[in-house]
């Protein structure tokens, strides 16, 4: 599948490109089938685009599903204003390269009240700038289906979520009120006002994602690769200290470390890991011996016991 606009700035570090093995091909086929089912069943689908590795794979699969046509639905980026600068640069280049329709939404209430992760804490910040903002954007666009890049291996509440995740008119998720999914048969019938979150990557693992990125040569944000970067130790995490809005607390010292990120979100709430992985092969080798979840680097998952399920019940991604 050729790029509509070649761009050398969006290339990963040089890597071997192995053929797509049968396991990855089966996952790819399943995901493409889901994209086509949703496009046929629903009137106004949208794809949630958070710019990370899973979103990059999701977008690649969407492009494959409808090639040689354009992706037939818009991308929605819920922008908190606190993303890594590299993520926004990457997003804009991707949109240009693939001729995509992008909707960017920032919660006007959060912006007016100057809600930040520093002043209001991660729980309230996430609720207003992510969950509430997402509900606003979905309502404004009258979208009845929203693709997301969540995987079942990431976290406990996501492990029990179906591929078609039904939401009430106020976007709430009730795990006890979901439909059975038999093989590849999905029931997309909804009542007026209801919607569905759709997760084509449900059955993928983190290593699957990286192997697919390698095999398909999918560009990703450079922050996933190790490099010397400024960091500060805070709340048990290494926070990247490249943004001038990050003010050092008493006793904190900025230093340089060779780091990378396993997961990307808002920079004040995303912890880096020490790593020497500068290529896709290095990243995959590192993950194959990893003993902790990628979500360990997300501060929002530490808010309280069961916090991710609580957020999802309220309408989170």
Swiss-Prot record:
Keywords assigned by UniProt, alphabetized: ATP-binding, Nucleotide-binding, Nucleotidyltransferase, Transferase
An MF annotation (GO) of this entry: sulfate adenylyltransferase (ATP) activity
Coiled coil: none
Pathway per the UniProt entry: Sulfur metabolism; hydrogen sulfide biosynthesis; sulfite from sulfate: step 1/3
Renumbered residue ranges of the record's region Disordered: 1-22, 298-317
Pfam families noted in UniProt: PAPS_reduct
Any one GO BP annotation for this protein: sulfate assimilation
Catalytic function, reaction form: sulfate + ATP + H(+) = adenosine 5'-phosphosulfate + diphosphate
E.C. number(s) listed in UniProt: 2.7.7.4
Subunit structure: Heterodimer composed of CysD, the smaller subunit, and CysN.
Assigned protein family: Belongs to the PAPS reductase family. CysD subfamily.
Function, in words: With CysN forms the ATP sulfurylase (ATPS) that catalyzes the adenylation of sulfate producing adenosine 5'-phosphosulfate (APS) and diphosphate, the first enzymatic step in sulfur assimilation pathway. APS synthesis involves the formation of a high-energy phosphoric-sulfuric acid anhydride bond driven by GTP hydrolysis by CysN coupled to ATP hydrolysis by CysD.
Protein name: Sulfate adenylyltransferase subunit 2
Provenance organism: Rhizobium tropici
